[in-house]
């Protein structure tokens, strides 16, 4: 109930302000601040873009959230956790069918910066593979807690993905 109200208020405020919502366009038009050639940290001033993103799902709130977004004609980027994807693969397919972007938020939501290269690779690639099996190509990786290092960037680059904070 509180989540739905918060989403309605935020969505209405954005729409009333006349802000365009374009999930995932930060790297497409060069408007983002890029670090190490692959990590998008923030949008440039004056770009008139707003990215609406949700992390840690899919969850019990995802279907209601999708309904609210659909009613308002809004698309968003959902950064999903692999453990949750295994329990709700049908929601991932529906999210994509409804025009939302799907991003990788690692398999178990661990702080990547504190993991070995192999453990980071496993956290990221296992989600990429789960998504591929569902017909989803994830162009963006959002490290949990915003924690990443040069190894994370290299793994993302090898996957053809960008780090998106």
Listing of model-derived features with the role each one plays in the protein:
Residues 30-115, 119-120, 126-132, 136-138:
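Active-site beta->alpha N-cap acidic-glycine motif
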Residues 11-13, 23, 72:
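N-terminal regions of proteins, emphasizing targeting and processing segments when present
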Residues 17-25:
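C-terminal segment of classical bacterial N-terminal signal peptides
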Residues 29-37, 150-153, 157:
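Short, compositionally biased "basic patch" segments
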Residues 137-139, 147, 152-165:
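His/Asp/Glu-enriched short active-site or ligand-binding loop at hydrolase and phosphoryl-transfer sites
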Residues 1-13:
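Bacterial N-terminal signal peptides that target proteins for export
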């Amino acid at each position: 109930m509180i989540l739905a109200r918060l989403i309605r208020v935020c969505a209405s405020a954005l729409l009333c302000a006349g802000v365009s919502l374009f999930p995932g366009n930060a790297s497409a038009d060069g408007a983002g601040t890029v670090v190490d050639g692959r990590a998008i940290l923030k949008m440039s001033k004056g770009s008139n873009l707003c990215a609406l993103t949700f992390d840690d799902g899919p969850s019990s709130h995802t279907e209601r959230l999708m309904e609210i977004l659909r009613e308002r004609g809004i698309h968003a980027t959902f950064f999903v956790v692999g453990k949750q994807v295994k329990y709700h693969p049908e929601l991932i397919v529906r999210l994509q069918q409804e025009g939302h972007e799907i991003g990788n938020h690692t398999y178990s939501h661990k702080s990547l910066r504190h993991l070995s290269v192999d453990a980071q690779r496993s956290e990221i690639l296992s989600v990429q593979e789960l998504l591929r099996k569902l017909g989803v190509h994830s162009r963006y990786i959002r490290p949990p807690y915003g924690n990443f290092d040069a190894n994370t960037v290299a793994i993302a680059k090898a996957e053809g993905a960008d780090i998106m904070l």
